Amino acid sequence: MSVRGVLGIGVDLVETERMRDAIERWGDRFVGKIFGASERAYCEEKGEPWRHYAARFAVKEAVSKAFGTGLGEHIGWLDIEVMRDSETGAPSVRLSTRATALAARRGGGRVLVSLSHTRRYAVAQVVWVADETA
């Protein structure tokens, strides 16, 4: 059931220091399981990449919550790619074929994303909305 076109919502909060600790402990093995090449390239060009990784981690969690599946059996970390508009800087997500098929089975639509981070926390909010009809 949707409310005025909303199919699902998801929010996630990540402590940036925990992300830094995970990256320091497990390195590329951890990063490669969670983040795609373009996400890694974007984060690594930043002065404190773990803050940007934390925000993208939060987006992936929030998307899985909006879909009502969590991450695991139905969609994985690499099925959700966080993108950034080159002109506006606005975040968006690109879903893999597998995640797109899941979304289609559950009502289609599109995913809207907002993310932010401070020195201590990264937060993401996702709203999964039905496609507009003419």
Regions found by a protein language model. Give the residues of each.
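Core catalytic alpha/beta fold that binds nucleotide/phospho-ligands
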Residues: 1-134
